[in-house]
């Protein structure tokens, strides 16, 4: 009998009934399937229920050897994953009102979820961030932010008038019409021989300086005068009448002023009218020197 007992080896399965063994196998399979099918971000309630489904023998043995460790939760891989906390930043002031209201709603829901999980599991879940907080961090609305500088630049562009050439004080009728410009004779240029009309100066500004050169006086006198182009039938008569008008208006009595007047007529008109101009000037000169009244 003793020899038989010495050769026979007892196993742990011989001491337990077969029904217990089948139950333990089924529990281990269900726990493995539950861990594989569950997502990475398990909620606090699911984590606590999965811990309660462990085998009773392991729990009894752990409480017998480590009585203080029964209060602390067992370590698991899912708990280590959740320890890595993500920093949550406050929303910037550039967000719209609609986005801020939605964020407030999300923060309220996340705070209520955290309160339920704290009451169910314990104080150690304070370090773990809930999935609602992760949704709060990753906001899928990139177009909700608006730059304040862009709004100011758009307002400034709206204030600028469309057409810079038109001033706000002028009416559209006056803005369309170009201003009247007086064309002056800037340089002493002899006109071409095939010109159709004669040119008559209308105004000559006299200078009181006695000492001046003939060239400078001629150029300045012509620059400050205006010329009118006329088509004439009797050019000698027209030249004579215009010379008399110029002498009477400007009160020309000095020889230098009369010479400037003659040079002005010669420079404005072509060479074909020079003989006619000289004849008209001689007639007016004779009348002035003799002191006779100028008859038209």
Curated annotation (Swiss-Prot):
Compositionally biased residues, Low complexity: 92-115
GO CC annotation terms, alphabetical: nucleus
UniProt feature, compositional bias: Basic residues: 78-88
InterPro entries xref list: DNA_bnd_dom_ovate, Ovate, Ovate_C
Keyword Transcription: yes
GO biological-process terms attached to the record: negative regulation of DNA-templated transcription
Gene Ontology terms for molecular function: DNA binding
Coarse class of the protein's main subcellular location: nucleus
Subunit structure: Interacts with BLH1, BLH3, KNAT5 and KNAT7.
Note: Plants over-expressing OFP3 have no visible phenotype.
Protein name (database record): Transcription repressor OFP3
